[in-house]
């Protein structure tokens, strides 16, 4: 009879990280907030759409605020205290996401805009006619 390897239940220990980075991707349609450690390994993330907002309500500053709060609360389990913030994109949730992370209790050490700017690359979308 073959011996079945026993799978003993091991408690998973969460690594403790004091300093982290918050990547805020604010597009016109959604806002994605990811909190990582210094090496870039994701600790927690949240989106406006995943926070219960659908359609045009995803692209509001309030939806970005809720997403940033959810990502920030989830990252507190790892012991993150200080955040360096990287903001990408022109969306409406840029500032409100930063303010929400500050309100959760993080000390924001640095804010950097990493929006990619083309050196005359792809053709942009046509202008809207309303």
From Swiss-Prot:
UniProt xrefs under InterPro entries: Ribosomal_uS11, Ribosomal_uS11_bac-type, Ribosomal_uS11_CS, Ribosomal_uS11_sf
One GO biological process term: translation
Signal peptide: none
Keywords: Ribonucleoprotein, Ribosomal protein, RNA-binding, rRNA-binding
Name of the protein in question: Small ribosomal subunit protein uS11
Lineage: superkingdom: Bacteria
GO molecular function: rRNA binding; structural constituent of ribosome
One Gene Ontology term, aspect cellular component: ribosome
Gene3D superfamilies documented for this protein: Ribosomal protein S11
NCBIfam families: PRK05309.1, uS11_bact
PANTHER family: 40S RIBOSOMAL PROTEIN S14/30S RIBOSOMAL PROTEIN S11
High-level lineage: Bacteria, Pseudomonadati, Pseudomonadota, Gammaproteobacteria, Alteromonadales
